[in-house]
Amino acid sequence: MPKMKTKSSAKKRFRVRPGGTVKRGQAFKRHILTKKTTKNKRHLRGAVSVHETNMGHMAQMLPFAGL
């Protein structure tokens, strides 16, 4: 059986919270911000949790996270 490896891209983008949920950053806030409203950029500022339907993919990408 091959070694289990953590996806390097996933370990840079996600953090596992103590309750077992996964924290992620919002998309659409890196560039082309001049055409976005201040309200839109403000709503994109905070971190959100990964949806429960995607938690299976998270467990595959982060096998040692205990998901």
UniProtKB/Swiss-Prot annotation:
Gene3D superfamilies membership: 4.10.410.60
Keyword annotations of the record: Ribonucleoprotein, Ribosomal protein
GO MF annotations, alphabetized: structural constituent of ribosome
SUPFAM superfamilies: L35p-like (SSF143034)
Keyword Ribonucleoprotein among UniProt keywords: yes
Compositionally biased intervals (Basic residues): 1-16
Origin superkingdom: Bacteria
One Gene Ontology CC term in the entry: cytosolic large ribosomal subunit
A Gene Ontology BP annotation from the UniProt entry: translation
Region span, Disordered: 1-24
PANTHER family xref list: 54S RIBOSOMAL PROTEIN BL35M (PTHR33343), LARGE RIBOSOMAL SUBUNIT PROTEIN BL35M (PTHR33343:SF1)
Family (UniProt): Belongs to the bacterial ribosomal protein bL35 family.
NCBIfam families, per the entry: rpmI_bact
Protein name: Large ribosomal subunit protein bL35
Species annotation: Paracidovorax citrulli (strain AAC00-1) (Acidovorax citrulli)
Name of the encoding gene: rpmI
